[in-house]
Amino acid sequence: MKAIIVLLMVVTSNADRICTGITSSNSPHVVKTATQGEVNVTGVIPLTTTPTKSHFANLKGTKTRGKLCPKCLNCTDLDVALARPKCMGTIPSAKASILHEVKPVTSGCFPIMHDRTKIRQLPNLLRGYEHIRLSTHNVINAETAPGGPYKVGTSGSCPNVTNGNGFFATMAWAVPKNDNNKTATNPLTVEVPYICTEGEDQITVWGFHSDSETQMVKLYGDSKPQKFTSSANGVTTHYVSQIGGFPNQAEDGGLPQSGRIVVDYMVQKSGKTGTITYQRGILLPQKVWCASGRSKVIKGSLPLIGEADCLHEKYGGLNKSKPYYTGEHAKAIGNCPIWVKTPLKLANGTKYRPPAKLLKERGFFGAIAGFLEGGWEGMIAGWHGYTSHGAHGVAVAADLKSTQEAINKITKNLNSLSELEVKNLQRLSGAMDELHNEILELDEKVDDLRADTISSQIELAVLLSNEGIINSEDEHLLALERKLKKMLGPSAVEIGNGCFETKHKCNQTCLDRIAAGTFNAGEFSLPTFDSLNITAASLNDDGLDNHTILLYYSTAASSLAVTLMIAIFIVYMVSRDNVSCSICL
C-alpha cells in the first residue's frame, strides 16, 4: 500500500528594521568648546560682527543732544554754559549727549585762562544731565556783597541783546564802586545758598579777573596777587591770581582786553550751601544751573544723521545685529553689542557626522549596529529622527519634537548669554555713572582691563554652551529611542543601539507616522505567512504491510528507551561510588 506523509512548511517574510539617528550634513561648521577644542557641527549661530565706521546718529527711542543749545547761533557750548549774552536759550532734555567739541574752545566774550582751571569741563558736566535749566534769579546780590559796594563790570566784546556792553549772566564782575573802597582787603567770605528745586544739582559758576599791575591798581587799588577759595560738598579749591605776563592775545581768541579771567564752578547737592572766599577782582556767582537726571556722554561729531541702536566713539552710529562685536574697543552708549577679543559662534545643530554605513547582518536575526558612527542623509526637516530599512529601501523621517527640544536648549543658551550681556552692560553702565561723578576725567577714561575681563567671561560662557549643546545629543537620542519603543510596542523586537526589528513592513508612510507620533501598528500588515504546502510522498509496496511497519517503529522506539534507561542507571551508580569503571588501553 502507499503511505502518505504530510510536510507543513511555514515560510515568514523578511522583517524591516527601524533605528533612531541624527542627520548628516556635508557642509560642516566649526565651533569651540571647553573640553573638546574645535568641533565640526551641522550649523552655527554667529554671535559677533565687525562694524564699519559710520556717521553719528540719534539714539533710537530717546532724545540725543548735540549742541547744548541748538537754537543759539554762533555760540560755542562754553558760551552757552557761561550764559554769554545772545547765547542764552533753552537746553533740550536728552538721555544721551555728544561731546563734539574735541579741543578746548574759548569764549568769544572775554579771554579765559583755560590752563589755570577746569572750566573746559563745564560743558561736559552739563551734558551729563538729562534736564538742565538756568535759574531765573541771581543767587547773590553782587552790588552789596562783602567788600562793596560794587558796580557790575561789562565788556564791549560781550554785547547784550540791545548791543550794549554786557557780561556772562552766570557771573557778576564786582568792581569797587568808588575810590573809597578801591583798596586792598583781607579775604572776604560770601555764602552761596541753594536756590534750585529739591533734588536738583546746583552748578554755581564763579571766577576772578586779573590784569597788569597798572590795571589792577586802577580797578581795585591793589596790584598784588589775590587769593580765592571755593568750597562745596567737602571739595575745596584754592587759587592765587597772576599779575601780568599773560599769553599772546591771539592764543585767547584775539580779544582786545589786556586782562584775563579764570573761571571755575562748584556743584552743590540738594539743600547744600557753598562758600567763596575772595579778595579783589572776584566774579561773584549770579544765575546758576539747576540740573537733574542722567544723560550718557560720548565723544562724537555733528551733525547727527538718522537713528541708530548704539553710538560708538570709533564707529559712530551702529545698528545692533549681533550681541557682540570684534574690532576696536571704545566707549559706547545705547543698545550696544559688547566687545570681545575673538569671533564667537554658538552651535546650532548637531555634531557633524559623515553619512552612516550599515554594518553587515549578524546573528540569527541579522541585527544592525545602528548609529554608532555617522548620520543619515535626507533628514532635512529636523536634526533627530528615524530610518527604516527593508524591501522598500531606506526611508528617513525627522522627529520635529525632539529637534524642537534641541532648538529650545540652544535658545535657552542664547537667552543665558543675553542675560550675561545685560549684566555686563549694567556693570559698564555703572562704571559710566561713576565717571559722571568724576566728569573731569571723562574725556580720557577707558577701562580696558574691565573690557578684557568681560570678554574672557563671555568667551568662556560660549565655550561651555557649545559643550552642553553637543553633549546633549545623547540625551535626545535616548529619549527618542524610548519614544520609539513605546510606539512600536509588541510589534517590534529591540535589537540594540537604537534599532528595532519590526513584525510588519514599515515604509515611508509608516516612518512619517512614527515621526509625527500618530503611528498605529494595527494599520500596517501583521507578519505574513506563505500558504501551507502539502506534499504527498508515495511509498512503494515491497511486501510490507501496515503491521510490519508499525512493528519496526515500535521495536526501534523501545530499544532506544531501554538504552537511555540503562545509561542513566549507570551514571547514577557511578556518581554514588557503587560502580567503578576502568578503561585500559
From Swiss-Prot:
Question: How does the protein associate with the membrane?
Answer: Single-pass type I membrane protein
Give residue spans on the Extracellular membrane side: 16-553
- Cross-referenced Pfam families, in alphabetical order? Hemagglutinin
**According to the lineage, what is the superkingdom?**
Viruses
Residues bearing glycans = 40, 74, 160, 181, 319, 348, 507, 533, 546
Q: Where in the cell is it found?
A: Virion membrane; Host apical cell membrane
Instruction: Cite the positions of S-palmitoyl cysteine lipidation.
Output: 581, 584
Q: Which residues form the signal peptide?
A: 1-15
Its keywords, alphabetically, are: Disulfide bond, Fusion of virus membrane with host endosomal membrane, Fusion of virus membrane with host membrane, Glycoprotein, Hemagglutinin, Host cell membrane, Host membrane, Host-virus interaction, Lipoprotein, Membrane, Palmitate, Signal, Transmembrane, Transmembrane helix, Viral attachment to host cell, Viral envelope protein, Viral penetration into host cytoplasm, Virion, Virus endocytosis by host, Virus entry into host cell
Q: Which GO terms describe its biological process?
A: endocytosis involved in viral entry into host cell; fusion of virus membrane with host endosome membrane; fusion of virus membrane with host plasma membrane; viral budding from plasma membrane; virion attachment to host cell
Q: Which cysteines are joined by disulfide bonds?
A: 19-499, 75-87, 109-158, 506-510
The record's principal subcellular location, in a coarse class, is virion
Miscellaneous comment in the UniProt entry for this protein: Major glycoprotein, comprises over 80% of the envelope proteins present in virus particle. The extent of infection into host organism is determined by HA. Influenza viruses bud from the apical surface of polarized epithelial cells (e.g. bronchial epithelial cells) into lumen of lungs and are therefore usually pneumotropic. The reason is that HA is cleaved by tryptase clara which is restricted to lungs. However, HAs of H5 and H7 pantropic avian viruses subtypes can be cleaved by furin and subtilisin-type enzymes, allowing the virus to grow in other organs than lungs.
Name the HAMAP family on file: INFV_HEMA
Q: Which family does it belong to?
A: Belongs to the influenza viruses hemagglutinin family.
Protein name in the entry = Hemagglutinin
Q: Which organism is it from?
A: Influenza B virus (strain B/Victoria/2/1987)
Task: Provide the taxonomic classification.
Answer: Viruses, Riboviria, Orthornavirae, Negarnaviricota, Polyploviricotina
- Its gene is HA
